[in-house]
């Protein structure tokens, strides 16, 4: 039997990164180097560049372009933008696919893909694909007051991702010590998802 040590407990009062919680659908772009071995299902491969293979996924499954196999057109978008998305490099790149026809819609006439990893992607990294955006950072610092300050700013000023949209969903708090995301909603935050009403 393999021994599993109890994990270290991260300190709560460490730096956090607070981003706007976009109301769309979870999505991912996965890029693998096929020359390194390992198994992958070619049926789900959307694009190839040299030894790199690209895949698209929702929160729970692989998706491919097509009416019955896609998730709000994300796989089709990935296929179309593959040459630029290969700039993400090898790895699993999570984000939110949002806009026209998805959840709140944000009053947009198109869809957007916003990457979650704000430390890696954004204006500070010239390799950030131009077809992607990054979830807006609302605040950074210690956990004491930052969460309430960011919630108040979002409530009063509306969405930073889509200026003028006054019904944003909430925030995501990334706790740097635990490497974990936590969400705080502007409405029904204390109510389980299945019981919340709009």
Per-range role (PLM):
Residues 1-198:
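Core nucleotide-handling region used for phosphoryl-transfer chemistry
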